[in-house]
A protein has these predicted regions:
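Glycine-rich NAD(P)-binding loop of Rossmann-like domains
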Residues: 123-156
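Oxidoreductase and adenylate-handling cofactor-binding alpha/beta cores
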Residues: 106-125, 159-166, 296-310
Length: 322
């Protein structure tokens, strides 16, 4: 079994790692982008554990891994070529954890909102440079938070907002808006009203072929110059180049993000990372010990179940049944 991309060698210290006792495990703490080198590295292994989307599992890679039988991971899998997995006889198992929010992601979203509204990174940098106050922040109480995506993380963030005295309004898919209304939530009348009326907008949507490029240049143009846009979900939910263009145009006035089109980025390869009206973090929304314990307990359970001949959470189950 190979575990990929454990950059800080964290997993061996988790309680759940003991579930792998009796299994020969190799943990890779670096990130390899060269397909030929990665294929050579992974060729001996029967099973892979993925660290979220840190490594893309492409058809080109899978075609060079004749021994591979299992890929175990958690949550959505846009980085895995499922068709190529099936063609190569590789079972993909992924616990979709329905009904369980990522409190780590929700808390990080709220941290970015707070940090941006109160200019915390800028104030800190200014102070460390030997200066005193450098500007005036904004309070959240009485302001409107627009949440795009009526799901588990969005609902958790809504709870934080309500505790801070914010007005919460929703938008999303037709089905999501319907669920929100049935639950007594405030839903914007139109998409344009949603973007126009909110002081802060945060996106909480899974990346699928249908949601790729969901947030457009037109949406950003509807936002006010004093508003904040937050994305801790996936960069590809935004139309390519649209956020940078929007920040340069001043609508929205600010943004806070945890996700990038290419990860990891090599500073300053992504111009968003150095934009003066943006604060950013290196995709750490899920990077807490507590979240790792939760996620990898599920991932390791899938390995054990496969080893026992009774795999769980199968995505391409047809190859197992056939």
């Amino acid at each position: 079994l190979a575990i990929l991309d454990d950059w800080f060698n964290t997993l061996r210290g988790l309680t759940c790692f003991s579930k792998l006792n009796g299994i020969e495990v190799t943990v890779f703490t670096d990130h390899e982008t060269d397909i030929a080198k990665l294929a050579k590295r992974l060729r001996p292994f029967d099973a892979l554990v993925l660290f979220r989307e840190r490594t893309a599992i492409t058809a080109e890679l899978l075609d060079q891994l004749p021994n591979l039988k299992l890929i175990s991971q958690r949550s959505v899998y846009p980085h895995v070529d499922v068709e190529a997995c099936s063609r190569n006889g590789v079972l993909l198992c992924s616990n979709m954890h329905s009904g369980t929010p990522s409190f780590a992601a929700a808390e990080h979203t709220w941290a970015l909102i707070m940090a941006s509204m109160r200019q915390i990174p800028q104030q800190m940098a200014n102070l460390q440079a030997g200066h005193w106050q450098m500007g005036v922040g904004k309070t959240l109480h009485g302001r409107r938070l627009g949440l795009y995506g009526y799901g588990r993380i969005g609902k958790t963030v809504a709870g934080y907002a309500e505790a801070f005295g914010m007005d919460v309004v929703w938008w999303g898919s037709e089905a999501g808006r319907k669920r929100a209304k049935l639950n007594g939530q405030k839903v914007a009348t139109t998409r344009s009203e949603f973007f126009e009326s909110a002081d802060v907008i945060s996106v909480h949507v899974r990346l699928t072929p249908e949601t790729r490029g969901l947030i457009t240049t037109t949406d950003f143009a509807s936002m006010r110059p004093d508003s904040l846009f937050v994305n801790t979900s996936r960069a590809a939910l935004i139309e390519p180049g649209a956020l940078l263009e929007a920040l340069n145009a001043g609508r929205p006035g600010r943004a806070a993000i945890d996700v990038f089109d290419q990860e990891p980025i090599i500073w300053p390869a992504d111009p968003l990372a150095t934009h003066p009206n943006l604060i950013c973090t290196p995709h750490i929304g899920f990077v807490t010990e507590d979240e790792f314990e939760l996620q990898f307990s599920d991932v390791f359970d899938q390995v054990i179940a496969f080893q026992a001949g009774a795999p769980i959470n199968m995505i391409n189950a047809q190859i197992w049944h056939s």
